[in-house]
Amino acid sequence: MDSNSSFNNFSIVIPIYNEEDILTESINNILSICERTSVDFEIIISENGSTDNTKNLAREFEQSNPNVILIESDYPNYGEALKRGFLKCKNEMIISFDIDYYSESFLKECL
């Protein structure tokens, strides 16, 4: 896709592991940015064997928002979490970042 192309949809892949302290605020911010676009989107949360309350918080997002899809794993493996997320994407345009390092300005620029 060249820089002059437009797109009708996108997927965001976010691997997570023990992120209960930042997950709710971060996903709400990401959803808010995405919902301001006129483009269909999905957010793939690839849970990575968390031992805290991350998995339950992610399930709540999936249940309350049709644009959020949760993939669960019982063991931590960052590479596998990314791979599972990419394989689940239904859209051609894919954005991926870590929940604790994402940038709102980067996401807005991508969209």
Where are these regions (language model features)?
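Acidic helix N-cap motif at the loop->helix transition within catalytic regions
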Residues: I22-E25, D52-E60
